[in-house]
């Protein structure tokens, strides 16, 4: 998997912003990416040291609009903890 395919976008919620002061950042990642690939990609792109990576797989949810049934897509989320003294400048300005 290529480096540009692993990280999709940051998760910008109130709960994810609360983790920024503890050097914890949340990103949506490719469903096929494993923890080693996520860690390597994050360190290469942002030039910081990663302490740990936790991943969560979310299943597709069924949604209904009247008699029509559809699905919201499944996705994978990674919670990335940086090592002590490391800071991610890109998201700290938000």
Swiss-Prot record:
One of the early assembly proteins it binds 23S rRNA. One of the proteins that surrounds the polypeptide exit tunnel on the outside of the ribosome. Forms the main docking site for trigger factor binding to the ribosome. The keyword RNA-binding applies. One of its GO terms (molecular function) is rRNA binding. SUPFAM superfamilies: Ribosomal proteins S24e, L23 and L15e. Part of the 50S ribosomal subunit. Contacts protein L29, and trigger factor when it is bound to the ribosome. Pfam families: Ribosomal_L23 (PF00276). One of its GO terms (biological process) is translation. NCBIfam families: PRK05738.2-4. This is Large ribosomal subunit protein uL23. InterPro entries: Nucleotide-bd_a/b_plait_sf, Ribosomal_uL23-like, Ribosomal_uL23/eL15/eS24_sf, Ribosomal_uL23_CS. GO terms for cellular component: ribonucleoprotein complex; ribosome. Signal peptide: none annotated.
């Amino acid at each position: 998997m290529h480096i540009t395919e692993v990280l999709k976008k940051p998760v910008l919620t109130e709960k994810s912003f609360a983790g920024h002061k503890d050097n914890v950042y949340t990103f949506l990642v490719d469903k096929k990416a494993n923890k080693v690939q996520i860690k390597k990609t994050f360190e290469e792109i942002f030039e910081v040291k990663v302490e740990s990576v936790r991943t969560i797989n979310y299943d597709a949810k069924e949604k209904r609009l009247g008699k029509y049934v559809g699905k919201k897509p499944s996705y994978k989320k990674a919670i990335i903890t940086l090592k002590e003294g490391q800071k991610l400048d890109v998201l700290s300005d938000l």
